[in-house]
Amino acid sequence: MAVALRFTKMQGIGNDYVYINGFQERIDSPGELARKISDRHFGIGSDGLVLILPSATADVRMRMFNADGSESEMCGNAVRCVGKYVYDHGIQVKDVITVETRAGVKIVRLLFEAGKVCGATVDMGEPELHPARIPVLTETSGDGSQQRFVARPVDVNGQLYEITAVSMGNPHAVIFMKGIDDLDLPRIGPRFEHHPLFPKRTNTEFAEVISSTKVRMRVWERGAGETLACGTGACAVAVACVLNGYAGRDVEVELKGGSLHIHWDEASNHVYMTGGAVTVFSGEYYI
């Protein structure tokens, strides 16, 4: 007999996930469920699945599964929505929510409009720039001169791209170029995602600098394909802008689904991401 599973669909600038309250619902095969519900024709339709669970180290724990069923370390847009979900559903009714992820505990400061949660600023932690910890395969010299992977030429299917590699808890390859709207991402995105340089695969951001305070990007997400937005990707692009001398530490990142404000704090080395969080609808899914 089919069992009704209660869910809420939420989105952060178009990056949409199905959220399930793990305090109340039991999910035995989350990867398989993610594949089914993410299908935009035969399921609910989403970029993946997020489980909100009890935590021993934070207010809640989130597990995030991509549309292909693979589990990811975290998602910046999703963690904002987790903060809103936790507040709206009375799991924790306070302005600052701590969320345990596979990339560490994230601090989510909720933003309110007319008494309702409309978004959040998230402390995304410090960017990881050491190639081995991103991870990206490269030779590291003894004098430390190869401790960052910045604007390095990489052959991808016979074409050279300058890649800057950053981890925001998950791996990112950032490429700066003109004409990002003309890119055939479904064709070239998988070539980066599965490139042997990245042993855990990678998210790939194609970024176009508009000014010292604004940059546009498109993203090919590991396990999900092209999405309207990627929070950790926007953070990686902002960090890469600074590393390449293209922008300052406060930058607006414009994605297909909307814009995020990213601040890379020089004193703490932490990256802060600010953006919206929206509930789309709730319902029951039968399994």
Swiss-Prot record:
EC code(s) of this entry: 5.1.1.7
EC category: isomerase
A cellular component term, taken from the record's GO annotations: cytosol
Entry coiled-coil feature ranges: none
Chief location: cytoplasm
Residues reported to bind substrate: N15, N66, G76, N77, N170, N203, E221, R222, G231, T232
Ranges that cross the membrane: none
UniProt-annotated location(s): Cytoplasm
Record-annotated site: Could be important to modulate the pK values of the two catalytic cysteine residues: H172, E221
Keyword Transport attributed: no
Keyword Hydrolase on entry: no
Enzymatic reactions: (2S,6S)-2,6-diaminopimelate = meso-2,6-diaminopimelate
GO BP, sorted A to Z: lysine biosynthetic process via diaminopimelate
Family stated for the protein in its record: Belongs to the diaminopimelate epimerase family.
Function: Catalyzes the stereoinversion of LL-2,6-diaminopimelate (L,L-DAP) to meso-diaminopimelate (meso-DAP), a precursor of L-lysine and an essential component of the bacterial peptidoglycan.
Protein name: Diaminopimelate epimerase
